[in-house]
Design a protein with these regions (language model features):
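Conserved small/polar residues in nucleotide/adenosyl-binding loops
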Residues: 208-210
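Glycine-rich phosphate-binding segment of PLP-dependent enzymes
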Residues: 15-79
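Surface-exposed amphipathic alpha-helices with a cationic face
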Residues: 188-199
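Local beta-strand N-terminus motif with an aromatic residue
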Residues: 106, 165-166, 201
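PLP-dependent aminotransferase-class I/II
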Residues: 118-121, 126-187
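Gly/Ser/Thr-rich loops at beta-strand to alpha-helix junctions
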Residues: 62-66, 87-93, 115-118, 175-178
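Conserved beta-loop-alpha segment that forms the PLP phosphate-binding cup at the N-terminus of a helix
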Residues: 82-108, 117-127
């Protein structure tokens, strides 16, 4: 008898909580439906068909499937371009490919959000022997931390650009292993707008986890 009463109480508690959260669940479902509708619209407008799912040679030449998935991802994440490759084995691998693809000997890379992820330290050359790193290819690395006091970020960036002409600015959205707050998309937009006003040719590379 006691067991049955406890089960009934538990059942009522679950139903009560479920009812109180029904509005939240509905909002989440609506968000999912909206995003799904957006994805299906992109697939339709990009004219994705069964032919794009056929096996390719793997050489990458005239690979319509690869070009199509790049276009779909670029539109989905509101990017100018996208490179979607299963050959990227990690986030560090993907970021390294971007850095080595853009930077050339004599260029300056400026990090605005302090120390980068530890896996990038050896890629840059600020830790380890430096063989094959950006430093090894005579690419100069500098860093500041605008997150310590974001209200004064403009002053710090302007001062850095007065001292150096940067080819690439690296912005890490996530706090990583530090105690700082993660940057919002709006804050990153403000940073990029300021940088492009100082140097339209400077590339802003923002690391965002999706």
């Amino acid at each position: 008898m006691i067991l049955n009463n406890n089960l009934k109480l538990a059942e009522n508690a679950v139903l009560s909580v479920e009812e109180s959260l029904s509005k939240v669940f509905q909002e989440r479902s609506n968000q999912v439906f909206q995003k799904l509708e957006n994805i299906l619209t992109i697939f339709k407008e990009e004219k994705v068909s069964t032919s794009h799912f056929n096996q390719s040679s793997g050489s990458g030449h005239d690979d319509i499937s690869r070009e199509k998935i790049d276009s779909v991802f670029a539109r989905l994440f509101l990017a100018e371009k996208a490179a979607v490759r299963m050959q990227f084995v990690s986030g560090t691998h993907a970021i390294s490919s971007v850095l080595f693809g853009i930077l050339r000997p004599g260029d300056v890379m400026l990090t605005l959000t302090g120390q980068p992820y530890d896996t990038l330290e050896e890629v840059i050359g600020i830790r380890g022997r430096g063989k094959g790193s950006l430093k090894d290819f005579e690419i100069e690395y500098k860093q500041i931390n605008i997150c310590e006091n974001f209200d004064s970020f403009e002053e710090k960036i302007v001062h850095s650009f007065q001292e150096n002409s940067c080819r690439l600015v690296f912005i890490q959205k996530s706090c990583g292993y530090s105690w700082r707050k993660s940057l919002t998309n709006h804050e990153i937009e403000k940073i990029c707008s300021l940088i492009h006003s100082l140097d339209p040719n400077c590339i802003c590379l923002s690391l965002i986890h999706i």
